[in-house]
């Protein structure tokens, strides 16, 4: 399976529709894509073929299902972006992110809990 970073925005947009609707018939996916993104049938099938070839979806008798959960793909994509833009430094990423706006008290508590949950012991 290909790396998530090889998924252009158009492929990620189609993946979002698939995750939200799966299993979804290809004709229904075309309708959803037209409604949500203004894409023609040929555009949807071109993108869909790329996703099948990359191993992100299965097209079984015109029924489309994903092969990877949304959370996994988004996590991989985030990790690759942090690696590319911040040299893999999570503190640098958080500094850049937090410099734009303050966290609410609830958001800060949630982040502290996540850090505690994922901190290595020893």
What do these predicted ranges mean?
Residues 3-10, 62-82:
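Short, cationic-aromatic polyanion-contact patches
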Residues 7-10, 23, 87:
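Short helix-coil-helix linker/hinge
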Residues 12-17:
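Pre-recognition alpha-helix immediately N-terminal to the DNA-recognition helix
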Residues 18-22:
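Short helix-to-turn junction characteristic of helix-turn-helix DNA-binding domains
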Residues 24-33:
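Short acidic, hydrophobic short linear motifs in intrinsically disordered regions
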Residues 45-49:
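Short, hydrophobic-biased segments on the C-terminal half of alpha helices
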Residues 52-62:
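A short, conserved structural fragment
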Residues 79-121:
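Amphipathic alpha-helical dimerization/coiled-coil segments
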